[in-house]
Amino acid sequence: MGRRLPATITGLAMGFIETLNNIADRIEGCAAVIIFGIDGIPIERQVRELDPSADIDMVATEFTALVRRAMRTAADTELGEMREMVLVTDDMSFLLRPITTDYFLLMAINPGGNIGRARFELRKAQLSMEAEFAI
């Protein structure tokens, strides 16, 4: 992937793969789930039922602009921190949860997928990963 991660994150890479795999297994319609940094560079991913023409890494990179703007808007309006972002398109839904202010979980869900379950599973994963990413 080309990105050098802090030693604590590198040592946990297998744990991240397992976590993402478990999330994807529990959510009907999960196309992909990815951990990426605020710079848009993917750290780890699990791809399941993703259309071959869809590039989940590109989606994550593009999401960084939305995430930065949403975080800035939340701070500027004093509404608190951004907790979750949802984007629904004709072909796919995307759920995003911050792990920290610098790292995020993004899930792509195919039409008919279980968005409620996805929200629940991403929240659980976010809580379990917070300490691992707090460097």
Where are these regions (language model features)?
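Acidic, low-complexity cytosolic segments
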Residues: 2-32, 38-135
